[in-house]
A protein has these predicted regions:
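Two-component/phosphorelay signaling modules centered on CheY-like receiver
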Residues: 9-31, 160-183
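Receiver (REC) domain switch/output surface
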Residues: 97, 106-130, 137-138, 243, ...
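Conserved helix-loop-beta segment at the catalytic/binding core of cyclic-nucleotide signaling proteins
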Residues: 286, 335-369, 378, 382-390
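Active-site-flanking beta-strand signature of metal-NTP-handling nucleotidyl enzymes
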Residues: 154-155, 293, 315-326, 349, ...
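Catalytic-core segments of nucleotide cyclases and related cyclic-nucleotide turnover enzymes
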Residues: 366-377, 400-423
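Short regulatory alpha-helical coupling segments
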Residues: 294-315, 334-344
Length: 423
């Protein structure tokens, strides 16, 4: 598949390998520019992606280029433009949110990372276009969340060597952390949690690392995950790099490994946010873009309808409230998304401002609802982490089932002291 440009390659010395790799991938047109001319080139012809093929010792020129990218984003309604930066000796480039790649790796891998980042740009463009289209039909257009994606990102740290505690600590200063001491634990976390990056620490042999990389390579949804491998597994990285474009070996301290991975983690979390936003737009705002559950006003409207339908048909209906008193924003959002995955297709839910989650079980009596709610609470306790990194988020569950004399207000009043007011 050809890469539709233009693409800007910034370097004071000719970057023939990068240009040739881009041409081999079908990229067109390719604009080469020196650092002194980079800002003017971007202004004249805004690129789809930027490759910093060599470093820039002049911080003023780098700042001018960064400002030019900000201006381009403003003109394009904030559209994301990927910047891939070659870093000498694995040093982090002094360029905000640049996706670093070691200068010594083949240029084909650089193009692979650019292609992965362009998928996020395409998704972002689709979301912005759909928002403009929806705005012509209704005034109730949901806003794209603008918080830092790192605030809701989660990283899997797998390993059982001496570096594992320091990696978890370093990652926990920036993002949510899920620890795994075995490849089975890592695979379980991948299936049950929202993961935006993986760090494979020391303590694993080559076969274990290969097994974990195979799990990632075999599923399309994992292939763009940023993966940092700590340890000397060069041969494995080279063999999996064609199918895992964001796979890289990192050395140095735990803080250095996390610093390298953070721009990739932020980008992956942003991509997940865009997918939730697209689902929200598909549902014309009925789905909350943060949680993936129903928007609050829609939930209470649907609850009223479900109560009326159940009363007319004589069908069972139950409601549960999951309260998470110790949860911060990140934990609360992840819990809501996890509940969304655990629910049956006939059920619906929303999250309130206090992070509590209301879930309606249609055609379900109190006994059956108790079984389902207990299973959800058990998964939350086993899977979720508290803010201090300890497993087991405290989850209080209250249940009620519809009685013949019930209204929506009386049903909800039995599970909460002060029922939320529908918007």
């Amino acid at each position: 598949m050809a890469l539709q440009g233009p693409f800007a390659v910034i370097a004071d010395q000719p970057a023939r390998d990068v240009v040739e790799a881009l041409r081999a991938a079908g990229a067109y047109p390719i604009i080469e520019a020196r650092w002194a001319d980079a800002a003017a080139v971007l202004h004249a012809r805004p690129p789809q992606g930027v490759i910093l093929a060599d470093g820039c010792a002049d911080h003023a020129r780098a700042a001018v280029l960064e400002k030019a990218l900000e201006v381009q984003a403003e003109h394009e309604a904030g559209l994301f433009t990927p910047v891939i930066a070659r870093a000498r000796d694995d040093l982090i480039p002094r360029f905000a949110d640049a996706l670093s790649i070691a200068a010594k790796v083949p240029a084909e891998r650089l193009v692979g990372r650019l292609t992965a980042a362009l998928r996020v740009r395409t998704l972002h463009a689709t979301v912005l276009r759909r928002m403009r289209t929806l705005a012509t039909r209704t005034n109730a257009v949901p806003d794209l969340p603008n918080a830092d994606p790192l605030d809701e990102a989660g990283v899997l740290v797998a390993g059982r060597g001496r570096s594992h505690p320091s990696l978890c600590t370093a990652a926990g200063e920036h993002v949510g952390v899920i620890g795994a001491l075995t490849v089975e634990g890592a695979a379980h976390a991948l299936k049950s949690r929202d993961i935006d990056g993986i760090i494979i620490g020391d303590g694993f042999g080559a076969r274990v690392v290969e097994a974990l990389l195979t799990v990632l390579a075999e599923e399309a949804r994992f292939r763009d995950l940023p993966v940092a491998v700590v340890g000397n597994h060069t041969a494995l990285i080279e063999s999996f790099a064609p199918v895992l474009p964001n796979l890289e070996r990192v050395g140095g301290s735990a803080a250095h490994a996390i610093e390298y991975l953070l721009p990739y983690i932020r980008l992956h979390a942003f991509g997940r946010r865009l997918k939730r936003m697209l689902a929200c737009l598909d549902a014309k705002g009925a789905i909350d873009p943060d949680t993936g559950l129903l928007a609050n006003a829609v939930f209470w409207r649907d609850l009223n309808r479900a109560v009326d339908t159940a009363e007319k048909r004589g069908a069972a209906l139950s409601i549960a409230r999951f309260s998470l008193p110790a949860a911060d924003r990140r934990t609360g959002l992840e819990a809501a998304r996890l509940v969304g995955r655990l629910m049956r297709h006939v059920d619906f839910a929303c999250q309130e401002a206090d992070k509590s989650i209301f879930t309606v079980f249609t055609e379900t009596d109190l006994r059956a609802a108790h079984v389902v709610a207990r299973r959800i609470a058990s998964v939350l306790k086993k899977v979720m982490l508290t803010t201090d990194g300890k497993a087991g988020v405290e989850t209080a569950v209250t249940l009620a089932t519809l009685k013949p004399s019930d209204s929506t207000e009386s049903l909800v009043a039995r599970i909460v002291e002060e029922p939320p007011k529908p918007a």
